[in-house]
Amino acid sequence: MKVLFISKLEGHKWQGPTHSVPMQIKHQSNIDEVLWVNLCASINPEWKDLPYYRESEKGLKTRLADMPADFQKPDIVVFEGVYEYPFAGLVYDLWARKIPYVAVPRSALTADAQKKKPLKKLLGNMAFFNVFVGKAAAIQYLTAAEQKDSAKWKTPSFVVPNGMLPKERTKQTFSNEGLIFSYIGRMEQYQKGLDLLVSACSRIVRELRAAKVTIHLYGPDREGSFAQLREELARYSLEDIIFLHDGVFGEDKERVQLESDAFIMTSRFEGLPMGMIEALAYGLPALATTGTNLAEEIRDAEAGWTSDNSVDGIAQMLRAAVADKDRYPERSQNALGLSAQYNWQAIAEKTHGEFSNIINRGK
């Protein structure tokens, strides 16, 4: 099977698809003949060393005829994302040649995501994206929760998650005094629910201080996010509880994970957050809202604590995590067990099966 992957990724380390897309394609290449075409220049030099990777700087002008000869008629095409106008030229060729394609929206089609920049989304949907999604052979959602929250889109769909490789080092000991909760990811107040987290902490600030809880947020300062957060922290006098840090990567990121007692993520919406799966793979218990799309799995596995996407719910989740301190080693082992479900090669095999079904339906 010839599978053509199309993306528009600059390769910033703080973006989840920078990590998940290459790993997905790498493991798919063990089963299928793949070509990965990125419709912009990447800052990741290691991608250029991959035998199946190409870069096209034509953007909107990229067409199927620009592909290598053996991939000008692929069996199926995968668009890594939805809201990318550079996909437009290629998709017209696919419609003309009746080549099936799959769109991977990564939460972009959920109800909450559609509320972000709603006018821009409305105009974009009317101009192109309604038809782009509607004519897809299928949408690949990363979780059942994402699929359910994207129910307004009537395109056939299936669920295949992101994966994670096992970690050589995992969490072994927890703090004797106090608790350290960490978040690593984008500092987007709305999507990541950081405003909800700050408000929740303000409700139980005395309890958090008494338990010596500190919450460390790591991520790039983009669009004035740090200034906004610092203003909120000062308003609620939370500067001794919530701390802001620049993004961490590689060995520094691993150190932060292993020095933390739990990973916290209070997102309003996600596809499948690689940061949280990675934290589970280190054996970190998780504090997760329903918007992360992992809350149900974490609750069922007893790998952490969960809440709805409300300030009161997050406050109660924090209380539960503080009260449960003696159970952190047990929840750590459960986190490792949960992360083992996200094996990349098994995911590639499941994806191959879904692609085969799509191709066979079209024959």
Language-model features: locations:
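Glycosyltransferase donor-sugar binding loop
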Residues: 38-42, 184, 213-228
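Aromatic "clamp/platform" in nucleotide-sugar-dependent glycosyltransferases that forms part
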Residues: 268
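Conserved donor-binding/catalytic core segment of Leloir-type glycosyltransferases
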Residues: 4-6, 140, 164, 173-192, ...
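Membrane-proximal helix-turn-helix segments that form the acceptor-binding/catalytic region
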Residues: 121-139
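Nucleotide-activated donor-binding/catalytic signature segment of Leloir-type glycosyltransferases, i.e.
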Residues: 227-248
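Short hydrophobic beta-strand element within catalytic cores of glycosyltransferases
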Residues: 285-289
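Conserved acidic donor-binding segment of nucleotide-sugar-dependent glycosyltransferases
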Residues: 300-312, 320-326
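Short alpha-helical donor nucleotide-sugar binding micro-motif in glycosyltransferases
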Residues: 247-248, 255-260
